[in-house]
Structures are given as structure tokens and as C-alpha cells.
Amino acid sequence: MKENDKLEKLDPIATLEAKFAKSTYFIADEIKNEKVSAISTGSIHIDQITGINGIPVGKITEIYGNESSGKTTIALQTIAECQKKGGTAVLLDLEGSFDLNYAKSLKVDLTKLIITQPQTGEQAFDMIETLIKTNSIDLIVVDSVAAMIPESEYQANMSEALMGAHARLMSKGLRKIQPLMNKSQTAIIFINQLREKINTFFGNPEMTTGGKALKFYASLRIETRKADLIKEGINKIGIKTKVTTVKNKLAPPLQTCFIDVFFGHGFDYDNEIIDFAIQYGILKKNGSWFYFDDNKIGQGREQLKNTLLKNNELFTQVSEKTLAFVNNEKINQ
């Protein structure tokens, strides 16, 4: 018999029970396979590609992209949807760029939105930690990662090089809040920006700010890219944005959709309903005419939309049938 075989074998469960709290360990089959709840983004297209119907609760989401590609609009529309369900949202406005009028146009209830303006990245993470621990916040939006300046940068001279300070801040801060997120009912959105890598000749020359920590800790990463301008005659009235779930730990990743973001009022929800109604055959097309329940309701897309918007009862019927199909598809995924 080997010497090691003579050693007393201890019951691992009993040993853990004696030293640690029961909440720190469990048997694998005790884990409940619960469906992750989510907050709608206000866009059916985006909700669908997330695979969970929006921004996951108890998880970290990163929304990143180039300037004017719809990042802030998605975040604000998510705040509005959170409030519609009776939830409480907090915006950490590190950039100091919050537009009251635009938020109001997106149906954000300004009387219920809590806004904070932390001076440093450390202060921002302290606020996030405090808010999560209250157990009363449903959504936290951080705008933006690029503006989460480390305290060391405030104290340093302009000539001092502080390599990696931002990345270290993000790594430490996310490491602190991640364990809290696992037990919370709070969703967090970090808005981030793309930067050009210096001296990059091969591969993707773009990178997000703040190092690699957010990529690691985020359960969902959404990329936005401006695909085209939307024009009405010679006037530019909005942008068409390509939205991609670059990372998704809760559903299949790399799903893509295109959304219309109109200047001054965000997503065109009515258009999205019509898109899906046509896709699922709720609105049928024969030649140039569109039909609903065998009734002719519009010749061409523009007339179809005008007819639906003028008839609330008809639009409600189309919407309810369409959303039933969309939700049924999510259930069967």
C-alpha cells in the first residue's frame, strides 16, 4: 500500500460546511436553470438578436461603436422601457453630455430618472457598488467608459505618462462589482467608444477603450455601426445602424440586425412592427398591395404605414398578432 493511501480521507462536503457558509457551495444538480430576465431595448429587432428579449438583468452589458452610431439612443430607450415597467434607472453621466430634450423625446420620464456625475472612475465604481447594494435599482447606465478618468490622471501633470492606468481602473472596478451582480436584480450598461490602434497594419485597427477587462466581464457585447444615412429629399433625417451581438453568453452570439434611428425621436417602432408583420405573413403582399385578414389596406409600403397609423384599432390588431409571433419564436429558441 502506498503511503498516501494511509492518509485519512475526509468528506469534502462536511469539510466545506465546517469552514464556509452554505451559500458558497452547492451540488451541480441543485442549480436551477432559470430563464434570465431582461429589460427591453425598445427595439424589437435588437431584442430579438439578443436571444433573451433585451438587456440581461444581473449581468453587465457593453454597447460600443463609432461616434453617432446609436449607442446612447439604445441606452436611453432601454431606460424608458425600464421605467414603463415601473423600474428605477440611474444614469452615470461622466461625459456631462446628457441631453434633456432628446431623452424626453424618447419617452424617458425625467421626473423619475436619477442622474449622477462622478468626477473620477473610482468614484463611479463606488457609486455603482453602492447602488447595487440598495437592491432597489433596476438599471444603471454608464456614459461612458472613455470618460471614466482614473484619479491618478487628475493628480498628475499633463507631461506625466500614466500607461495602463485606465485599464487597471476598469479591471479593479469590474472585479469588485461582478460578485455583487451575480446576486442582484440590476442590469448595467457600459457605453464605450472605438479608437484607432496606433501602427496597426494587419487585422482590425479598431479597439474599445479601457483595456480588456470589460470584454471579459460583459455577458453581452453589442456593437453599433452607422451603415447609411436616411434622407427625405435632400434632408438627412436619421441613420441606418447595423447592430451586432459580438459576444453573448446567454444566447447564440454574432446575430445582426439593422435599425433606423431618426434624429430627434430615436427608433421607429411602428416601422419595426410592419417589418415583422410582413416577415411573419400577418401582412400579406400581392403585387403592390398589402392585405390584412384578406382586406386590402394599402398600395405600397408608404400607404400601408399611413393607413395603419391613422387607424389605431387596426394597428393594435396587427401589433398584437405580430408580437405574439415574435414572442413565440423566442420561447421556441
Swiss-Prot record:
For this UniProt entry, the molecular function terms from Gene Ontology, in alphabetical order, are: ATP binding; ATP hydrolysis activity; ATP-dependent DNA damage sensor activity; damaged DNA binding; single-stranded DNA binding
Q: Where in the cell is it found?
A: Cytoplasm
Q: Fetch the PROSITE patterns from UniProt.
A: RECA_1, RECA_2, RECA_3
Q: Which Pfam families match?
A: RecA, RecA_C
**Cellular-component GO terms for this entry:** cytosol
Instruction: Output the InterPro entries linked to this UniProt entry.
Output: AAA+_ATPase, DNA_recomb/repair_RecA, DNA_recomb/repair_RecA_CS, P-loop_NTPase, RecA-like_C, RecA-like_N, RecA_ATP-bd, RecA_C_sf
Where is this chain primarily localised? cytoplasm
Query: Which CDD domains does this UniProt record tie to the protein?
Result: RecA (cd00983)
**One GO BP:** DNA repair
**Which residues make up the binding site for ATP?**
65-72
Key words, A-Z: ATP-binding, Cytoplasm, DNA damage, DNA recombination, DNA repair, DNA-binding, Nucleotide-binding, SOS response
Family, per the entry? Belongs to the RecA family.
Q: What this chain does, per the record?
A: Can catalyze the hydrolysis of ATP in the presence of single-stranded DNA, the ATP-dependent uptake of single-stranded DNA by duplex DNA, and the ATP-dependent hybridization of homologous single-stranded DNAs. It interacts with LexA causing its activation and leading to its autocatalytic cleavage.
- Name under which the protein is recorded: Protein RecA
User: From what organism does this protein derive?
Assistant: Ureaplasma urealyticum serovar 10 (strain ATCC 33699 / Western)
